Amino acid sequence: MQILLLALTIGLAYAHQTLDPSEINGQWHTISIAADNVEKIGEGGPLRGYFHNLHCYDGCKNIGLTFYVKLDGNCQRFDVLGAKQEDSDVYVAQYSGTNHFEVIGKKEDAIAFYNHNTDETGKETKMIVVVARRDSLTEEEQQKLQEVAGEKGIPKDNIRYFRERDTCAQ
């Protein structure tokens, strides 16, 4: 039920399927981030990532993520590799702690990820990150994202929409 609702709410065609590298590989940018710990995604927060590239390896058993985080006003590049867990659609990656993430929706020009981060101190953060090859979500997608975020325990006030692209690595 939740998967069906998610497909409808974010407006992305979702199905448990093998990811196709031709659909994933290439340039993407962050258009929305939501988290239950809003300080983690605020300006200068360690989980406020500005995505630039996704790449599948080994038939998408591994996903490479290239993103930038602005720390102390400076852009820092991160190249992170997520390894798919056996018998699961969940990937595990190390960045600002341990991350368990999965694709919860995708279509040609947008991908939504759900991420569960446990930082080095043990603090847990639930997140939704939407990356795209377009500049924004539609109003309907924004409204539905708020509903899904609420179901994941993320207050709608903690959703950040990126109206413009980041200035890192231009």
Swiss-Prot record:
Record has Cell inner membrane as a keyword: no
Record PTM: Not N-linked glycosylated.
Annotated Gene Ontology cellular component terms: extracellular space
Compartments, record wording: Secreted
One Pfam family in the UniProt entry: Lipocalin
Tissue: Expressed in submaxillary gland (at protein level).
Keywords: Allergen, Disulfide bond, Secreted, Signal
CDD domains: lipocalin_OBP-like
GO molecular function: odorant binding; small molecule binding
Annotated disulfide bonds: C56-C60, C75-C168
Signal sequence, start to end: 1-15
The keyword rRNA-binding is assigned to this record: no
PROSITE patterns (alphabetical): LIPOCALIN
Family: Belongs to the calycin superfamily. Lipocalin family.
Family matches, as PANTHER family: LIPOCALIN (PTHR11430), ODORANT-BINDING PROTEIN 1A-RELATED (PTHR11430:SF65)
Protein known as: Lipocalin Cav p 3.0101
Organism: Cavia porcellus
Gene designation: Lcncavp3
